[in-house]
A protein has these predicted regions:
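Generic beta-sheet signal
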Residues: 2-7, 47, 101-109, 132
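Catalytic core of membrane glycerolipid acyltransferases/transacylases, capturing the structured
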Residues: 3-84
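Short His-Asn-centered micro-motif
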Residues: 6-9, 50-53, 108-110, 116, ...
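Short catalytic/ligand-binding loop motif for oxyanion handling, primarily in non-cytosolic enzymes
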Residues: 12-16, 57-60, 115-117, 143-147, ...
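Internal catalytic-core helix/loop-beta-alpha segment
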Residues: 71-115
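A cross-family acyltransferase "interaction/gating" segment
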Residues: 101-104, 111-179
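Short, well-structured alpha-helical segments that form the helix of a local strand-helix-strand
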Residues: 180-188
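Short, highly charged C-terminal tails/helix-capping segments
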Residues: 199-215
């Protein structure tokens, strides 16, 4: 319990669904494979994810997904496509704390599926307050494979990757909110220094790898 997974974000639902599978596959002794999904009959149930309340109320599927461990929170900076400024709802923070006490929580600290957007300070405050083990995750390929919701396949044959890193070393008492935000930014590879032009040779190698991918 009290484990917080922090990740970059590429789709609304495919990212989280993949993490549920990977976590349960790993707990079942599998390495780099989610084949033979027998573990779904006895999954780890105390896995939660933080999601925007507005997103989880939009449509039937979103409402169904909300029952699969969503901790819904109100965005403080955006609502219905418009920029807003509002205070953090203390109940949202409390609900995340309750989820951490019960199990594992997944959060996307940028609060958006757009790449290289700023890390929201709310995640750093949660870390300072509840002192969880913080495990960074870096995902790739989901944005190219799926639509924004992560439901409809946009392009087949794209390799999706998920790198689960070592826990972050955090001094909960002495590190500032800004220090923690900076650590998160680098850990999930969303700092501006990670923006780079991929050489043509690398792109070709990735395409060849996708062709060899086993489903």
């Amino acid at each position: 319990t009290n484990v917080l997974f922090v990740s970059n974000h590429q789709t609304y639902f495919a990212d989280v669904t993949a993490m549920f599978h990977v976590f349960n596959a790993s707990l079942s002794g599998r390495v780099d494979s989610i084949k033979n999904v027998g573990y779904i009959w006895q999954p780890k149930l105390n896995i939660y994810y933080v999601a925007a309340k507005e997103t989880m109320n939009a449509g039937l599927l979103s409402r169904i997904m909300a029952y699969a461990g969503a901790v819904s929170v109100e965005r403080t900076w955006r609502a219905k496509g418009q920029e807003v400024e509002r205070k953090v709802n203390p109940n949202d923070t409390k609900n995340i704390g309750t989820a951490l006490k019960d199990g594992w929580v997944i959060t996307f600290p940028q609060g958006t599926t757009k790449p290289f957007k700023p890390i929201r300070k709310g995640t750093a405050h949660i870390i300072k307050q509840y002192k969880p083990v913080v495990i960074p995750i870096v995902i790739d390929g989901f944005r190219r494979s799926f639509d924004k919701k992560g439901i409809r396949i946009k392009k087949r044959g794209i390799l999706q990757t998920m790198q689960i890193k070592e826990p972050l070393q955090i001094d909960y008492e002495n590190e500032s909110i800004e220090d923690i935000v900076s650590k998160l930014e680098y850990a999930i590879e969303q700092h501006s220094s990670f923006q780079k032009v991929i050489p043509a040779e690398t792109v070709k190698e990735m395409e060849e790898l996708n062709k060899k991918r086993e489903y």
